[in-house]
């Protein structure tokens, strides 16, 4: 006799996929069925035992013993099934506990991960604020020390020309951060001394102070301080005023100045193109600041040897300055000098002579023949004549430069001004005459060498050639020439700012 117990709902065709809850429910039903079968088999085993204990035929006893063995075997199978079912139920309960614990731990891990992310973000924000605070503190300390130093120096300075009622208005501004060739060696104070005079746009004092700091750092070679300082200020301006704002263009010019000093001409050119676009949009295409940026771009292209690209930029800057400032303005003459240098590097000597001649006429009309800019322009024109082998014209220009009977006002006694004012002009022009004298000396050496067919002589021999052979004058004229040369030598030790060639070095 055998009894089979099937799970309710089972078709017997194969295993079915059940979820854990359904499996536990069916296992419990099977346990109940097995317990009922066990009770039934115990009852059968009892009846068989009673039957075997009573008298009966031998054949009947053998049959009863066989049935008893089958029942006992079934009881063993039922007990085994019950044990396995109990184990399954216990395992199911344990798995349920583990699953609940796993879900709890998983939720806790998610919460901890969120808290960790939040803490990381807070830490990064705190570190960023700390770095910004440290940079701000360092910047303020540097600015404080710089301003204290400037304050200590200011008490020894004479009154500035811009503070005297009889002085003409200055047009130096932060709009021209790459000065013209005559202005390139002026100090940072000259570059940031005044606001823009055209279009009603005034450079903020904060940017002028920042520009002075950047110039100071760059002159010391501390570009690792100057560049982050510029970039931080640029980001602050873009956040507060937007990208298309004149102050942003000014800041781009300052950063381009730092890159130019590092000989990173490509990066500086990109920044100046951005500044040019901003100034054209905000100030108009014919604003003096646009002309200054165009001139700066032309200077950069010239330093990179890209003279063809620089020339139209310089030409456009000239047209703007002629229209806004007038055809006889000093800035127009400076622009003509730059344009002449670009043309000279391209071999356009006819244009070079025309531009220098016009610049010379402007300087002579404004300052007379004693204006230092007249001597500089004549020296540049003489150099152009030398490159064309026009030795006679170059000799005449060098004679005019060296034979001036009267020197500029700062070299003699003050005429209608205080000694302090004259000394201030002397200091501003010292490097100008120093470089001019050196340039004239080199040009004269070339001229004498070519005229006489000799090699370049030393400095001592050159002085004799200049006095005896090249000038070829005598009497009072020779004395005046010698006196002028002596004055020019003295000027090289006392006077200031000069031109720089646009050609690459």
UniProtKB/Swiss-Prot annotation:
Expressed in postmeiotic male germ cells (at protein level). Residues 161-173 have a biased composition (Basic and acidic residues). TPR repeats lie at residues 207-240, 249-282, 291-324, 333-366, 375-408. Residues 90-150 form a coiled coil. The modification Phosphoserine is found at residues 173, 467, 503. Keywords: Coiled coil, Cytoplasm, Cytoskeleton, Differentiation, Microtubule, Mitochondrion, Motor protein, Phosphoprotein, Repeat, Spermatogenesis, TPR repeat. One of its GO terms (biological process) is axo-dendritic transport. Oligomer composed of two heavy chains and two light chains. Associates with microtubulin in an ATP-dependent manner. Interacts with KIF5C. Interacts with ODF1. Interacts with LRGUK. Interacts with VDAC2. Kinesin is a microtubule-associated force-producing protein that may play a role in organelle transport. Plays a role during spermiogenesis in the development of the sperm tail midpiece and in the normal function of spermatozoa. May play a role in the formation of the mitochondrial sheath formation in the developing spermatid midpiece. This is Kinesin light chain 3. It comes from Rattus norvegicus.
């Amino acid at each position: 006799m055998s009894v089979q117990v099937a799970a309710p709902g089972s078709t017997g065709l194969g295993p079915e996929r059940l979820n854990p809850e359904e499996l536990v429910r069916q296992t419990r039903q099977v346990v109940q069925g097995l317990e009922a079968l066990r009770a039934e088999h115990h009852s059968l085993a009892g009846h068989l035992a009673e039957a075997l204990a009573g008298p009966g035929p031998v054949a009947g006893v053998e049959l009863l013993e066989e049935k008893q063995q089958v029942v006992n075997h079934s009881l063993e199978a039922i007990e085994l099934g019950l044990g396995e079912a109990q184990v399954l139920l216990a395992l199911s309960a344990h798995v349920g506990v583990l699953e609940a614990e796993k879900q709890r731990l998983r939720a806790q891990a998610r919460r901890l991960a969120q808290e960790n992310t939040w803490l990381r973000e807070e830490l990064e924000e705190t570190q960023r604020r700390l770095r910004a605070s440290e940079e701000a503190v360092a910047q303020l300390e540097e600015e404080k020390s710089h301003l204290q130093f400037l304050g200590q120096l200011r008490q020894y300075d004479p009154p500035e020309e811009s503070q005297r009622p009889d002085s003409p208005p200055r047009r130096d501004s932060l709009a021209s951060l790459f000065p013209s060739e005559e202005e390139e060696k002026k100090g940072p104070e000259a570059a940031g001394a005044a606001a823009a005079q055209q279009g009603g746009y005034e450079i903020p004092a904060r940017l002028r102070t920042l520009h002075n700091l950047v110039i100071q750092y760059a002159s010391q070679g501390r570009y690792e301080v100057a560049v982050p300082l510029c970039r931080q200020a640029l980001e602050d301006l873009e956040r507060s005023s937007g990208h298309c704002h004149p102050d942003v263009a000014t800041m781009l010019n300052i950063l381009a100045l730092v890159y130019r000093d590092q000989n990173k001409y490509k990066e500086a050119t990109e920044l100046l193109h951005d500044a040019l676009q901003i100034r054209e949009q905000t100030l108009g295409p014919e604003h003096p600041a646009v002309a200054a940026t165009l001139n700066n771009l032309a200077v950069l292209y010239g330093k990179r040897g890209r003279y063809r690209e620089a020339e139209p930029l310089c030409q456009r800057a000239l047209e703007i300055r002629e229209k806004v400032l007038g055809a006889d303005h000093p800035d127009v003459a400076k622009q003509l000098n730059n344009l002449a240098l670009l043309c000279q590097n391209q071999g356009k000597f006819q244009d070079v002579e025309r531009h220098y001649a016009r610049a010379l006429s402007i300087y002579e009309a404004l300052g007379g023949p004693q204006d230092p800019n007249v001597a500089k322009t004549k020296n540049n024109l003489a150099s152009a004549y030398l490159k064309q082998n026009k030795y006679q014209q170059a000799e005449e220009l060098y004679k005019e430069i060296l034979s001036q009977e009267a020197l500029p006002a700062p070299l003699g006694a003050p005429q209608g001004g205080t000694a302090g004012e004259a000394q201030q002009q002397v200091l501003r022009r010292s490097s100008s005459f120093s470089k001019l004298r050196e340039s004239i000396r080199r040009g004269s050496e070339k001229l004498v060498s070519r005229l006489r067919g000799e090699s370049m002589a030393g400095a001592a021999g050159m002085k004799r050639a200049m006095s005896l052979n090249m000038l070829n004058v005598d009497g009072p004229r020779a004395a005046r020439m010698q006196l002028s040369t002596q004055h020019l030598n003295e000027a090289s030790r006392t006077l200031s700012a000069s031109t720089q060639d646009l050609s690459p070095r």
